[in-house]
């Protein structure tokens, strides 16, 4: 007798710098899908992608979820398959809806979304276009600019222009003519603050450019601003909904990777204490930003807000936001009256719309 439960394939890990974050997010998502509330709705098949991009079946995936760490060599069957995707693991044929819990390149950038699209199967989150545009900060910012959405001044740098001392100095001089210190140097295609540097002077700018260039050919350099960091969650496909607005507070100089994912290094204010009308503006901008880049399913839209100037800037969109214990996306929906268990259920249902 066929099962009445929907079979959900949760894909996690991935060949990116955010592999460990993906594992932590997957633990939360799988736990919520297998909760007492959802147990009669969903059957979960976990699939693990190792750091070389190889896809592994449920046996390996469950071990990784249990240990909360990347797979050890002895856990992977030999001989090892070639690097990268070769075929879907055993058991995948039963999957009805795919749930990618992948952060960074090869998971959040439209590549795995393209695979699911070719397979003709529904999946959680944005499609190829929305994922690709939102992942690449330069493409995303160009779309925001074309739509007239507010953002801080920024400039693009190509890693090919940093190959020798004279070129590097020329790039730095050009940036200094356009931006003031401090500024932030970012790889265009990484998330979770991986590879980002804050530059207060020419030397730090050059170091930051080299660091970003080691991770990505496309580099963004943004004007630093004195601002609060606010976030809004978006859910839905045909009709997008927004959560309350939350604020990230931290003692560090800026919201880097360690601050983002370490216990007691930051705290949240949900809802964020904001002047009348500001939350409504941010929620409206969040919807406009998602529509601008064709993002749907789920997204977290990040903002900068300067109260003294009453100015709001779009920072970025994350189409596969984290689901760790420190992640804002599920917390924002919890504060908006949607439990974690109901949230993952809605995401799976939305995938089939």
From Swiss-Prot:
Keywords: ATP-binding, Cell shape, Cell wall biogenesis/degradation, Cytoplasm, Ligase, Magnesium, Manganese, Metal-binding, Nucleotide-binding, Peptidoglycan synthesis
Alphabetical list of InterPro entries matching this protein: ATP-grasp (IPR011761), ATP_grasp_subdomain_1 (IPR013815), D-Ala_lig_Van_CS (IPR000291), D_ala_D_ala (IPR005905), Dala_Dala_lig_C (IPR011095), Dala_Dala_lig_N (IPR011127), PreATP-grasp_dom_sf (IPR016185)
This protein's record includes keyword Nucleus: no
Pfam families: Dala_Dala_lig_C (PF07478), Dala_Dala_lig_N (PF01820)
Pathway involvement of the protein, from the record: Cell wall biogenesis; peptidoglycan biosynthesis
Domain ATP-grasp: 141-349
Enzyme superclass (EC): ligase
Sites where the protein binds Mg(2+) 2: 316, 318
Disulfide-bonded cysteines: none
Compartmental location: Cytoplasm
Family from the record: Belongs to the D-alanine--D-alanine ligase family.
Protein known as: D-alanine--D-alanine ligase
Organism: Prochlorococcus marinus (strain MIT 9303)
